[in-house]
Amino acid sequence: MVSENSLGRYIVGAYATSPNLVTWDEKSELIYFNLLKKIPSIRGLELPFWGESLHPFDDQWLLSNLDSKWENVLTCVPGTMKYLETVPRFGLASVDDNSRKEAIRFYRIAFNCVNNLKNHFGNKSVIGIYITSSPYQNDQKNYADRESFLMSLLELASWEWGNTNILVEHCDAFTKENPNPQKGFLSIENEISAIKQ
């Protein structure tokens, strides 16, 4: 994902500072995007996937205002966390097969969003998609395991992603040193083990 052209330029998770994270005002978002476009060190944006569409308010607006030269990534963490509020076993690593299949459907929608961006801007417009090894686990609740995550990874890898890399965004895991994790997804060791297979 690093090229000579990308050195000194960054993928920015600007959505977290957007004036329209929870409400929609097209004018203020346009000002915000135009300011982002003026920053030469921005290589692309980390675009949040909330679970239903490319943009939480207006897909066409995003397609009309995203810089066509940017190389972006789609992060599925926001949508995953939203799902987990009501479906605590939701995720690619879920030991509950129905919840794991629901996560696969979620990622199929994300896959379609990636293709929508690529069809509009070209193949280089989405260089990666961040996935997670949800759901939660600790010493009392064990909703996830490496084998379920591996099964999901194999299914996602069978889709035609082209030049878009599937990237596991490691989140905090339950350990003796971290007995009350915020997310509590799989350990990095289990994630790496699943990826290697």
Range-by-range predicted roles:
Residues M1, T86-K196:
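Active-site acidic/histidine proton-transfer and metal-coordination neighborhood
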Residues M1-N112:
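N-terminal pre-domain/capping segments
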